[in-house]
């Protein structure tokens, strides 16, 4: 299959380039900028896109355009730093901009296949402190903004393009059309990426690989693992065994909902009740990083024991399926090549595959979350399961600030349930990316009836986001928040105050721990 290969130069938006291209029906993959010639050629590239990045081309050890990229003789598009790197490569001049450009700018464009079907002026999103001061020989201007005279360029052959703005972000008008024009008009690539074809290929692939053996799956009830469970069921039926671990850190009635949802889908699941074990291991622990590690290790132990019992019972379990997504693969590749600052330990059960005697199946390892949701819809997963808000692997433990106790879990489950219930009642649930309640480790004075109270505080958090990398706090109606706060204080024993978190990401993370 022909592929649009995106080389990553470090931009926070790089994954969006791949997603935008795929959304238009063309297969794309992401590689680090210093990937080998063989890595790129193995993908059968039809076009190359160079992402943006934080470096300056004149810095020591700055990422550069590898020679072999030019030797491939296929169309190239450089975005932001990618543009500057191309200009530098061909002998042009890049310097610090006299005025940094961050945010909206008006782009004026000339007639060109890259801008076919677009108006002569439109808004784009800039994010750069360097700019091109002189074009290399053989290049010409096809777009300019007030502060970037070379905001869009190409060579005279029309095979190498560069744009100073970011077409991959939603802030750029017609950005997806620009990327599509590059792939279809410039690179002459035919559409080759369709979810129905992918599903059929994966089902056949799983059947061929697994044969008559059995597959176990760690089922959380979230979107990724639920869609994997459904795909495995379509492929191998009862030879797929989903395992659901009840950690005691789930939302109110979540175990019952998961069991009921999969009963309706006709899929049998194995439920392991490990509530007491998780709570016992967490006793007295307040540090969030320590809580995550304990939960991760406990989950591995519980899942391992359950798997060994099933192996003893069935004998022919040979595979472990995981809901690994493309961003997980990308992040692991990045971390292999360079050290990255760790903000939180992620609960992706990292030690599980090494401990279990099974081969790994990851049917979605090259998919993004929105693509998995599309597959779920095609396979018949109910909308309420497809559109569920993200839920952290450690569960409510990272929404209880401080020690996790039975009392805190019950209070938080009830408060969170009220918040989500009201969001759904008021048609707001699908309008926010994620919403939840947080149990705070403080008490406050209050008055109920004629009595003084000294009870717990609940924080509400709701954010709008595209992919969780950045997020804005949701401007929920005041009347709605008032109603939720009243219900929580009146219906949840032990709570006398409710606050609303109005911090965006950055500087805060979405979860409190």
Swiss-Prot record:
Q: What is its EC number?
A: 6.3.5.2
GO CC terms in record: cytosol
Q: Which reaction does it catalyse?
A: XMP + L-glutamine + ATP + H2O = GMP + L-glutamate + AMP + diphosphate + 2 H(+)
Q: Where is the GMPS ATP-PPase domain?
A: 193-388
- Lineage, top-rank taxon, reads Bacteria
State if DNA-binding is listed as a keyword.
no
> Is Transferase tagged as a keyword?
no
Q: Give the enzyme's main class according to its UniProt record, as a single word.
A: ligase
Per the record, the pathway is: Purine metabolism; GMP biosynthesis; GMP from XMP (L-Gln route): step 1/1
Catalytic residues, per the record, are: 80 (nucleophile), 166, 168
User: What's a Gene Ontology MF term here?
Assistant: GMP synthase activity
* Cross-referenced Pfam families: GATase, GMP_synt_C, NAD_synthase
What PROSITE patterns does this protein's entry cite? GATASE_TYPE_1 (PS51273), GMPS_ATP_PPASE (PS51553)
* UniProt-listed InterPro entries: Class_I_gatase-like (IPR029062), GATASE (IPR017926), GMP_synth_C (IPR001674), GMP_synth_GATase (IPR004739), GMP_synthase (IPR022955), GMPS_ATP_PPase_dom (IPR025777), NAD/GMP_synthase (IPR022310), Rossmann-like_a/b/a_fold (IPR014729)
Question: Mind listing the UniProt keywords for this protein, alphabetically?
Answer: ATP-binding, Glutamine amidotransferase, GMP biosynthesis, Ligase, Nucleotide-binding, Purine biosynthesis
Q: Which residues form the Glutamine amidotransferase type-1 domain?
A: 3-192
**So where does ATP get bound?**
220-226
Name the HAMAP family on file. GMP_synthase
Summarizing the function annotation, the protein's role is: Catalyzes the synthesis of GMP from XMP.
Instruction: Give the quaternary structure.
Output: Homodimer.
**Full protein name:** GMP synthase [glutamine-hydrolyzing]
Its ancestry begins with: Bacteria, Thermotogati, Thermotogota, Thermotogae, Thermotogales
